[in-house]
């Protein structure tokens, strides 16, 4: 992560409106990862990440920050839902599978990077194999030195190969069918019970390694053959052991885990009875966040320096209802604010690929023009805010519901009205939505 905190915040600003405190917190945490790696090894071991707890109502940008962060991190990043895990000993996924999944992400990232580095060599090798299929080598004659008459034939054959190579690179042979030898991959899936993903993965690995030595003849178009053979050649050129060791080191030093909906595993005050998806999961999470060693199929992983970012709405439970040890492991608390009508106006217009832009571009594919006036957007934002205020506040997600309702008729009829256009102004918004927005019973179910 070579981006500065200011650059990270600026990048997040392109997609997320407001919530500057949360953006600054994650920007500092990401930059601290880079700062730590510049230190000597002895001091580096002593500096642990400061985990972050993001608190805020639903639909204000917590999950969106995680999504955009994964693009910026350039490090192994995993987003998981806390509700998907159960206490060790019960049927379901245990929390250690978080680290196993993170390692899988890191291995995939490292392999893709290694393949990019050998891409040109792999493409050359694939090209030679395709040329061999297009121009089979001349049949062998008598043993010994070639005669004077045969030597020009060799030159001619070489010239033919050059001609085909040129045609191949120009894409003139893309649709021609050839027969090539490719690796035979197993065509079956192993299904396993919940919580047994690791064993299933190992079984599939064994089956794949057994069948990867075999090859089979396939008839393919040249462009498909180049792609498949290129992947095969790249796989031969990369060092799998090096990929695994690099991935493990990357997880240990730079891994980031985003735990969403952590408030849903908090045991509420006054609740009685065992709940395997709540306090037990918190206690299982504790060793991971504190620092422990997890066994994965690629080797042992120490979690001491993995950064954990948790988020939750906490509208029923409070952060103080988390088990005390876990509270202490999330020293940075960030509160995200509820969105206002002005925020909704900005969400509809400012972010990259905003909602209004998405609908405009979608209908443009039907040769139908769609545009929004300022007063139309303002009225949309007001209705979204009013409905949130009167019923359940679901934040910016309300805009998706309202936009779908507003443009339902336009989207349906756009195909029959190619070449036409429509402008969404305040009057059009009122005509389509006012009655629904004012009727509390209707808005509760429809908007």
UniProtKB/Swiss-Prot annotation:
The keyword Cytoplasm applies. PANTHER family: ATP-DEPENDENT CLP PROTEASE ATP-BINDING SUBUNIT CLPX-LIKE, MITOCHONDRIAL-RELATED (PTHR48102), ATP-DEPENDENT PROTEASE ATPASE SUBUNIT HSLU (PTHR48102:SF3). It holds the Pfam family AAA_2. ATP binds at residues 17, 59-64, 260, 325, 397. One of its GO terms (cellular component) is HslUV protease complex. NCBIfam families: hslU, PRK05201.1. Keywords: ATP-binding, Chaperone, Cytoplasm, Nucleotide-binding, Stress response. GO terms for biological process: protein unfolding; proteolysis involved in protein catabolic process. CDD domains: RecA-like_HslU (cd19498). The lineage of its organism: Bacteria, Pseudomonadati, Pseudomonadota, Gammaproteobacteria, Legionellales. A double ring-shaped homohexamer of HslV is capped on each side by a ring-shaped HslU homohexamer. The assembly of the HslU/HslV complex is dependent on binding of ATP. This is ATP-dependent protease ATPase subunit HslU. ATPase subunit of a proteasome-like degradation complex; this subunit has chaperone activity. The binding of ATP and its subsequent hydrolysis by HslU are essential for unfolding of protein substrates subsequently hydrolyzed by HslV. HslU recognizes the N-terminal part of its protein substrates and unfolds these before they are guided to HslV for hydrolysis. Its main location: cytoplasm. One of its GO terms (molecular function) is ATP binding. It comes from Coxiella burnetii (strain RSA 331 / Henzerling II). It is found in: Cytoplasm. Belongs to the ClpX chaperone family. HslU subfamily. Residues 136-160 are annotated as: Disordered. Residues 148-159 have a biased composition (Basic and acidic residues).
